[in-house]
């Protein structure tokens, strides 16, 4: 164990956290797209020279887990050809990226000629080229039909901006001004982080800072090992189901085999062969899914760095499978599907080991991208993911209900829906409704968080809509004996309502065009419940009904609570009903 002065350790740790927070604020305040500045679909991290992650932000989990293998891949790609002033860009899943819309910037930090740190920023660009706006192409049979792949490439070389390379990238993207603005914001964030780190090195020197970082990683390792020692040794298995894509694949299953031995864990993933559809997951993304499933169980205190995973080994199964995809498998939906299902499989396995530790599953992402030409602004092209459309409910745990409208499992509460008024200001749409959905939270002693309903209309133009995600066929999984009776309210939905009132309902990923006067309605599922619903206190169920979160029928059918037409609790009927069940 390192002997580091605890005061110095606390100051260095605080300085690292400040550097990361300043990176986040820079992105929020200087980026161009609503996906960045409203929804915060980005993540920042700091790495040391090894390169190992020394600090992750409280950002998007699916980004952060994949950064660990991606950083090593990028650094190894350039080897000794990394110089002061270089900036590297990358999105390719074949190089441990997540999906090609998540573009990552890596800035090496040199101090007195020595590489000491990396500042890293990953964010979801609203477009990456390809035949479908926003990149989600449900008809893609290969990765080449999804958009621009960017293997590790230097956008700045020894401090010089490479305009030819940057122009090549941006020329292949829709709504170029938005993508360029977000790319520049990423550069600003990495540079701000670099400045803070150099100030830290000026104060304490390389050796002292490295000693503190080693201790912080060791501390995270000790926390995780202590948790695993409290879990009974054994083999645990969990299987989660991917919904029918409508492409002749049927339902697909992912199984996680978790072995706990002392203070170590080994995770083996079993998945079917990769498919000619955009739900394949390459290794970097799948590793992140395993880590997310583990962290739904672990609940360890900070610091959060690569030390957490020293005692965890991951085997994704044979190459060419759904969770260990190889070129040219299409993949762009992978950060939601199958990643959320993969994380669920790990969570289900760990629930067998220690059910009191797990969180029920969160609602899966079930959202839309929109694109068109803005009639208010010289018909300029726009394209964006509507982040308010992917706000599902959080899972409950042994002590509390799931949070409503907290975002999908892949983001674990870090994704913001953004202000509806700012969405309308930024894009030519009218929001008719944005609300929580009654009976959408999974039933349990602790109820799952409610999902959301968004209704929008294009204004004075035809709007392309891309529906993606899951949760439209299978309800969110609960935990510890939770069970649902009302299934329909707990499912996501995508509805195209025409001017005459006729509606088209979609349960799979789809492309459609909406005209002025028509509505696109997107419903996100709620989170899973925890524990037996019949153990939920009567007063709590009554409060849920009065707040519109549970219907009178839902109270009776799922919780055994009888409420009359005046909204009053019938205790005698309730006790009889619960006794009969």
From Swiss-Prot:
Activity regulation (UniProt): Activity is dependent on the presence of ATP and bicarbonate. The requirement for bicarbonate may be related to allosteric activation through conformational effects, but it is also conceivable that carboxyphosphate is formed and acts as a mediator in caprolactam activation, forming carboxy- or phospholactim.
Pfam families on file: Hydantoinase_B
Enzyme Commission code: 3.5.2.-
Binding site for Zn(2+): 41, 99, 102, 124
Cofactor binding note of this UniProt entry: Binds 1 zinc ion per subunit.
Cofactor or coenzyme needed: Zn(2+)
Record flagged with keyword Zinc: yes
Presence of the UniProt keyword Hydrolase in the record: yes
Gene Ontology biological process terms from the UniProt entry: glutathione metabolic process
Keywords: Hydrolase, Metal-binding, Zinc
Induction: Induced during growth on caprolactam.
Membrane spanning residue stretches: none
UniProt GO MF annotations: 5-oxoprolinase (ATP-hydrolyzing) activity; metal ion binding
Class of this enzyme: hydrolase
Comment on protein domains: The tetrameric structure and the presence of a connecting tunnel suggest that the activated lactim moves from the CapA active site to the CapB active site without release to solvent.
Function, as annotated: Component of a caprolactamase involved in the degradation of caprolactam, an industrial compound mainly used in the production of Nylon 6. Catalyzes the ATP-dependent hydrolysis of the caprolactam ring to form 6-aminocaproic acid (6-ACA). The beta subunit is responsible for hydrolytic lactam ring opening. The enzyme cannot use 5-oxoproline.
PANTHER family xrefs: 5-OXOPROLINASE RELATED, HYPOTHETICAL 5-OXOPROLINASE (EUROFUNG)-RELATED
Protein family: Belongs to the HyuB family.
Subunit structure: The caprolactamase is a heterotetramer composed of two alpha subunits (CapA) and two beta subunits (CapB).
Name by which UniProt lists this protein: Caprolactamase subunit beta
Organism for this UniProt entry: Pseudomonas jessenii
Taxonomic lineage of the native organism: Bacteria, Pseudomonadati, Pseudomonadota, Gammaproteobacteria, Pseudomonadales
Recorded name of the encoding gene: capB
């Amino acid at each position: 164990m390192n002997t580091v002065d605890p005061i110095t350790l606390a100051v260095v740790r605080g300085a690292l956290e400040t550097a990361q927070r300043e990176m986040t604020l820079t992105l929020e305040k200087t980026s161009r797209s609503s996906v960045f500045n409203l929804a915060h679909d980005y993540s920042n991290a700091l790495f040391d020279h090894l390169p190992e992650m020394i600090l992750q932000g409280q950002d998007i989990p699916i980004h952060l887990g994949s950064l660990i293998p991606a950083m090593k891949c990028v650094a190894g790609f350039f080897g000794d050809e990394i110089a002061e002033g270089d900036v590297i860009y990358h999105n390719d899943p074949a190089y441990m990226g997540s999906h090609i819309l998540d573009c990552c910037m890596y800035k090496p930090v040199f101090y007195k000629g020595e590489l000491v740190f990396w500042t890293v920023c990953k964010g979801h660009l609203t477009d990456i080229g390809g035949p479908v706006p926003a990149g989600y192409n449900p008809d893609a049979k290969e990765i080449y039909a999804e958009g621009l792949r960017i293997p590790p490439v230097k956008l700045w070389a020894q401090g010089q901006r490479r305009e030819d390379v940057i122009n090549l990238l941006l020329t292949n993207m829709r709504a170029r001004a938005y993508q360029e603005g977000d790319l520049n914001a990423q550069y600003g964030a990495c540079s701000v982080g670099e400045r803070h780190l150099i100030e830290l090195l000026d104060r304490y020197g390389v050796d002292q800072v490295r000693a503190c970082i080693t201790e912080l990683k060791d501390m995270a390792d000790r926390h995780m090992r202590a948790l695993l020692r409290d879990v009974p040794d054994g083999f645990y298995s969990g299987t989660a189901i991917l919904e029918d894509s409508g492409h002749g694949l049927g339902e697909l299953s992912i199984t996680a085999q978790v072995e706990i031995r002392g203070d170590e864990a080994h995770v083996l993933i079993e998945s079917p062969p990769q498919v000619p559809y955009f739900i394949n997951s390459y290794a970097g993304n799948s590793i992140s899914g395993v880590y997310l499933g583990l962290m739904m169980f672990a609940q360890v205190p900070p610091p959060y760095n690569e030390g957490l995973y020293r005692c965890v080994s991951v085997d994704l199964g044979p190459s060419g499978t759904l969770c260990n995809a190889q070129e040219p498998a299409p993949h762009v939906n992978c950060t939601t599907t199958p990643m959320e299902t993969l994380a669920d499989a790990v969570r289900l396995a760990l629930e067998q080991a220690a059910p009191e530790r797990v969180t029920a599953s969160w609602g899966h992402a079930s959202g839309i991208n929109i694109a068109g030409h803005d009639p208010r602004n010289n018909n300029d092209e726009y394209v964006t993911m509507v982040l308010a459309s992917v706000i599902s409910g959080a899972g409950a745990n042994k002590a509390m209900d799931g949070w409503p409208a907290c975002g999908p499992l892949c983001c674990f509460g870090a994704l913001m829906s953004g202000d509806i008024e700012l969405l309308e200001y930024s894009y030519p749409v009218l929001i008719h409704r944005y609300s929580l959905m009654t009976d959408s939270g999974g039933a349990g002693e602790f109820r799952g968080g409610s999902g959301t309903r968004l209704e929008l209309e294009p204004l004075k133009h035809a709007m392309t809509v891309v529906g993606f995600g899951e949760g439209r066929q299978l309800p969110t999984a609960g935990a510890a004996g939770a069970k649902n009776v009302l299934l329909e309210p707990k499912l996501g939905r995508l509805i195209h309502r025409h001017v005459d009132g006729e509606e088209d309902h979609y349960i799979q990923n789809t492309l459609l065009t909406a005209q002025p006067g028509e509505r696109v309605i997107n419903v996100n599922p709620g989170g899973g419940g925890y524990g037996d619903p019949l153990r939920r206190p009567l007063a709590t169920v009554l409060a849920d009904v009065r707040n519109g979160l549970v219907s009178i029928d839902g109270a009776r059918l799922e919780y055994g609570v009888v409420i009359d037409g005046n909204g009053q609790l019938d205790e005698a009927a309730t006790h009889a009903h619960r006794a009969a069940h």
